[in-house]
Amino acid sequence: MNINLLNINKWTSKPLNLNSICFPPNLSFNYDNTLNSINLDEKYCLNDKIHCMRKSAECHRQVRRFIQPLLKPGVKYLDICKKLEQKTVELMGRNDLKQGVGFYTSWSVNEVAAHDSAIPNDTRVLKYDDVLKLDFGTHVNGYITDCAFTVAFNPVYKPLLDSTKDATWNAIKMAGPDVR
């Protein structure tokens, strides 16, 4: 029985220093319809907001990188939630108004549509035939990175994971940067 996670990309770039003053974009797309009538004051304010968003996104990326190898059949939901949130606090500090945990971790396993969560004394464990979506958030100055990822161990679910991933990327490309 293969207990490797399906559909998780290899991490190719090193984690960035979260105290950096510059977070380069990891991925960019060309768009025809972008806002181009921004004055200098708006541009300065926008740059500050983008910095907060990129820092939050980088923290989220590092937490995903940390947690994915820990996802295995037999692991308790509660243990994963605790480790994930502890890693966020380790990287960003205690959850406060400046930066930290954007919202508590939620799970969706199999037929559960969204927002289940582990509670104290929860004994549920991840199983080989489960399809798991793990959703968590980080924030900097209120700019929340809300991102989820889906994993499975059983190869029968690979087409489901591949089609979901393709649909997500197509939606991102179609939405563009000016969607509100």
Where are these regions (language model features)?
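Active-site neighborhoods and metal-handling regions in enzymes and metal-associated proteins
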Residues: 1-180
